[in-house]
Amino acid sequence: MNFTKTDFVISMGMTIAVIFMSFTFPALGMTGDSVQENEIPEFNITKGSADFAREQPEYPARPSEGTLTYKNNSANWADGRQTYLQKGDTEYLVSFFDNSDNQNPPEWKLNLIKFNSSGSYSESTIITEGESKTLTSADGSYEIGFNNLEIEDSAVGNETASVDWKVLEQPSDSTWIGRLPVVGGLISGANQLASVVGWIGAIIWHFVVQILVTIGNTLLIFYNIFVYFLEFMYWITTAYSGVVAGAPTAWASVIVAIPGILLGFEFVKLVALAISLLPLT
């Protein structure tokens, strides 16, 4: 048994005829009830799909220098006006922004902030072109130097500038064993290595989860298409049955039913062919 080109043409033609009659005949008042828009199954290919909103784990190294850039009206701080020096239970952050509240000339402000469960502690200073400034965190752990302020635009609403920063002092291992010569370096190196290994594991898991979510969403797309096909077939069968039943005469019902009968034969043939291809038959 084969599903030939002729079978395909008949199936497509009769499907179009059934859909056409189901929509147009009632609308023209020839037979059946008019199709209501809210009765048509809604197709949502992404129904039930999962969102992958996890951020990629950051490398655990402590940055030692860089450039902060401020651009007024930039979205979500995407211009790079802040940088985390350290993340974890206690976090340190440097930030750079215009403190003049849209006044001209701008007043460029630097912040060094410490966050932990007890609260936040901020040290700040104003910097102008040609100046070098230093900020020390509230607990004395970090000392940051700032220089090379470059102002690209001072116009109100378009303030844009950048400044270079560099870590002059940063936290070290505070335990007595961590301060021992050689041993302290080994422990610090081991801790850093463990952090990097953990980061590699987190990166691998991040991509594994992303792949699993992608595969799951792809399978869900095919499932949604299949379910919609069944829902649409049920709806169109119901609508078409109403068209056939509402024909004004018996002969009209027979004529209107011909496309559905032919389509039914082709569908049965297709199902029989699919069953014959199963490995157990």
Swiss-Prot record:
Main location: virion
Entry keyword rRNA-binding: no
Location in the cell: Virion
Region described as Hydrophobic: 8-28, 196-216, 219-239, 255-275
Domain of life: Viruses
Keywords: Virion
GO cellular component term of the entry, any: virion component
Miscellaneous field: The virion does not contain any lipid membrane.
Protein name, UniProt field: Structural protein 26
Species whose genome carries this gene: His1 virus (isolate Australia/Victoria)
